[in-house]
């Protein structure tokens, strides 16, 4: 029996517009339920929708970034279904002619993931289930917050081309980064700004399997776990000769299982028909010009980071954090040594910012530039640079601090030379290492730290010691 994993994704992304899709209610404001609402987004009879121009511009920008065909004329439809979070009894979305078709996202692995369509639609209200688990099952009551009703969404639908849970998770992670680079969405999954549904099946000996849908996966981890569980469930069922029903599933993060929600619906169940209150969406040249203000590419950032750092995993981590990457890129263009930048921007500073509870855009970049200049000129040691980074994170001028504490002029020591001296002065320890006693490394490390008065980096020193001792043992 040969099994093949097959999956496609449907991703809903909240756009960073100031107002809702079809009314003037603000998308952001106090977290008081049902305060950012009006007759339009509450679905009152007789109200008429007015399309949000900025949402259209953002969709065009995404279409350009994902190499898609942008339809100059597209249409809105009504998607009919009954649910308490949908006050009109239908959702305004795009049906047979979406704003974007035939796009793709190139992953950092080089694989291009085809995207069938990208369309505009409105969000539903938020359901709050009053129970110990926060889920509908076992809830005493369900409350509705219509602040989310009418928030502009884009839905991104891929072809079923994912060959593993890891590949699907990678796509979502890099799409998330792309949206952030463009500036059209914060795409924070934990806040519901990016929500993922997956359609998954397992082919048996080349024969197409039953497709099931898993709804509302709200983290990269959940995508991996849900798809892995579902693949194993299908395989086990086929081995037992059982039939997989076509259904819609949830994902329980506590058990890592996928309990059924309902029988899966088809497009016929939703009775799509053209939205009579909105004319066809006709794109004009000025909309395309406006879309140019949203620019940025995760893949380009990743390739730059890989060139600077040289290690795929570290380059990817840097590129996924837009603000961190932009700081690194700014200093790299100014000619700072990339080894120095990698230590400061990807190792020291992230830990410090995490400790003080600040984001990358909250630290004075001129302070970081000053610290980099001092170390690149050899006027301070790495240890002093780290101390000054702490001060910069606390909004203290690092130059003034260094002058007041007489830290300038403390140059980095020649660590290789110190290690050579310690090894020459301790031949017995070297002989013990050659005979297999690796514990002497700690003793030798202590001798180096004593000679440098604690200014040497312990991790780097241990690594250099082990390299030298290994060579001496050959």
Swiss-Prot record:
It is an enzyme of class 6 (ligase). Gene3D superfamilies: 1.10.10.410. GO terms for molecular function: asparaginyl-tRNA synthase (glutamine-hydrolyzing) activity; ATP binding; glutaminyl-tRNA synthase (glutamine-hydrolyzing) activity. Keywords: ATP-binding, Ligase, Nucleotide-binding, Protein biosynthesis. Pfam families: GatB_N, GatB_Yqey. PROSITE patterns: GATB. Its EC number is 6.3.5.-. InterPro entries: Asn/Gln-tRNA_amidoTrfase_suB/E, Asn/Gln-tRNA_Trfase_suB/E_cat, Asn/Gln_amidotransferase, Asn/Gln_tRNA_amidoTrase-B-like, GatB, GatB_Yqey_C_2, Gln-tRNA_amidoTrfase_suB_CS, Gln_synth/guanido_kin_cat_dom. It catalyses: L-glutamyl-tRNA(Gln) + L-glutamine + ATP + H2O = L-glutaminyl-tRNA(Gln) + L-glutamate + ADP + phosphate + H(+); L-aspartyl-tRNA(Asn) + L-glutamine + ATP + H2O = L-asparaginyl-tRNA(Asn) + L-glutamate + ADP + phosphate + 2 H(+). Belongs to the GatB/GatE family. GatB subfamily. Allows the formation of correctly charged Asn-tRNA(Asn) or Gln-tRNA(Gln) through the transamidation of misacylated Asp-tRNA(Asn) or Glu-tRNA(Gln) in organisms which lack either or both of asparaginyl-tRNA or glutaminyl-tRNA synthetases. The reaction takes place in the presence of glutamine and ATP through an activated phospho-Asp-tRNA(Asn) or phospho-Glu-tRNA(Gln). Heterotrimer of A, B and C subunits. This is Aspartyl/glutamyl-tRNA(Asn/Gln) amidotransferase subunit B. It comes from Coprothermobacter proteolyticus (strain ATCC 35245 / DSM 5265 / OCM 4 / BT). The gene is gatB.
